[in-house]
């Protein structure tokens, strides 16, 4: 099983965090369950392998569309996979569903909505088919980038301060003083929070909390043993009780239970580095 990440070209870097390809060379001999901590990035996914299912706070078992738009995930979720895995994806910046596609981000939180229903333009189906049929990994990534470039040239979107604020929260892993962002925005608190919710789908503070827990999960991913005081120090929690409370709220388990029981993808593949397209 292989998981690869690629960085976007400069013109799209305001909207795209990365592209990824996740695939298995052979069919799985039994159902595989992969879980993920809360996701602080929306995305677009093209499945060219076997159909699979999702379990999250909203859906006990959802048949995931072959191509879909994914909003933020505020709690841990699980994927149930069988057969051959073949998934190509675009990881978007936190506010990009709104900025790039003009979508109401809050409507997509915890959702996997069919791409053909969300974006009805004929070119969407054309690129989706090309991505499925492309044989090479780089070919699939280039087609995803071409798809976004096509849309970008049609709409010519511009980012604003909310995009910047959301990116700062994501890049700092939720470890920042919200007052600094508010002061820099030159907006009232109510206006800032309303505009942030409209473009990202969550309040700034809640988004920062999710991002920080995602960072913690990444620190312990694939490990069998960790130094917990060091982890909550790195994540800037004031005390262990606060750390455990937040972790349980967003994952449903204590940190030690999660470490022992989780089936994150990092347990099955090497942690990827982000490559440039050549």
Q: Can you annotate each of these PLM segments?
A:
Residues 190, 194-195, 202, 206-222, ...:
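Catalytic-pocket segment enriched in acidic/His residues
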Residues 198-202, 246-256:
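A secondary-structure capping/hinge motif
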Residues 1-171, 177-179, 184-189, 203, ...:
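Alpha-helical bundle regulatory/interaction domains
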Residues 210, 245, 261:
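Residue-level "edge-of-site" marker
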Residues 177, 195-196:
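Extended amphipathic alpha-helical scaffolding segments in membrane-proximal extra-membrane regions
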């Amino acid at each position: 099983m292989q998981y690869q990440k690629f960085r976007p070209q400069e013109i799209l870097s305001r909207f795209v965090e990365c592209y990824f390809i996740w695939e298995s060379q052979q069919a799985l001999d039994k159902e595989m369950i992969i879980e993920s901590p809360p996701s602080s990035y929306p995305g677009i996914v093209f499945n060219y392998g076997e159909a699979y299912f999702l379990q999250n706070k909203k859906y006990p078992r959802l048949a995931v569309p072959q191509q879909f738009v994914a909003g933020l995930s505020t709690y841990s979720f699980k994927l149930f996979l069988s057969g051959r895995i073949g998934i190509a994806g675009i990881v978007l910046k936190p506010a990009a569903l709104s900025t790039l596609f003009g979508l109401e981000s809050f409507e997509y939180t915890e959702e996997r909505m069919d791409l053909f229903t969300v974006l009805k333009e004929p070119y969407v189906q054309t690129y989706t088919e090309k991505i499925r049929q492309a044989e090479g990994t780089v070919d699939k990534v280039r087609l995803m980038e071409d798809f976004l470039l096509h849309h970008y040239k049609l709409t010519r979107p511009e980012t604003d301060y909310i995009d910047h604020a959301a990116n700062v929260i994501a890049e700092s892993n939720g470890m920042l003083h919200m007052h600094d962002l508010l002061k820099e925005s030159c907006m009232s608190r109510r206006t800032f929070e309303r505009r942030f919710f409209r473009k990202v789908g969550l309040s700034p503070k809640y988004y920062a909390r999710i991002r920080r827990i995602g960072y913690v999960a990444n620190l312990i991913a694939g490990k069998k043993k960790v130094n917990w005081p060091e982890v909550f120090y790195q994540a800037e929690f004031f005390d262990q009780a606060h750390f455990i409370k937040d972790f349980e709220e967003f994952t449903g388990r204590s940190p030690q239970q999660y470490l022992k029981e989780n089936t994150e993808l990092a347990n099955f593949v090497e942690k990827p580095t982000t490559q440039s397209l050549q």
